[in-house]
């Protein structure tokens, strides 16, 4: 519809979207999502799990967002003293995409053992989990419970 794209730009303009990228084969597709969000004038920050870096490099997301892609919880080159708390406060929306069964289980049970999960658990804004895994894994009752 005419004007629909303009409405989305206004809706996302100035909003901070934090995207957590996990170690699934669909990780490479998130570069397109980040690019689309940037075109809609959103501020995008990306956090990756260590396993995600096996599928796509942090440099890709840094090029698309113009900001540092966070991977290591203990990186000493952060902008803020407690980076995961600062980023959680900045977020208007937090999305984990693709979300592996492993990361879904971690956040469902309150485990925070990396930059992505600690930031996700600290964030008080709307959160979205976008599962991406083999159908048998997704349909497993344990995954469904999580």
Predicted regions and their residues:
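A cross-family phosphate/adenosyl-ligand binding-site feature
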Residues: 2-146
